[in-house]
Amino acid sequence: MASNIGYDVAGGQFDAMIPGGGVGIFNGCANILGYMRGAQFGGLLSDCENEKGNSGNDEEIYTKRKQCLSKSCNSQFADKYQAKLGCLFLANFLEAAGNPMHTYKEVKCPSVLKDRY
């Protein structure tokens, strides 16, 4: 299990280790099971932002980035089904958002996670 907040994100943001995303300033998960691919900051999403654009609220740019990320997820994790699902979660459910703002609250770590690690 890893916890990562490098204090290089804004208030209301935190780092979540998702296959296809980056590992942030403290890259403790960089080599775990080969799930972290792409740039240290932003992972495959950063690669797509650099390729397709990363500015403005242009719906076309967002669509191109999501398509790029989905394609990268499917190719980079073709043989790692669970990692591919995590990466596609970043692309589809999280709308390929790099550092989105969230409303969240701290909760006690569930025993199912503590028992696993």
PLM features per residue range, with description:
Residues 1-117:
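Mature exported/compartmentalized surface modules and terminal targeting/interaction regions
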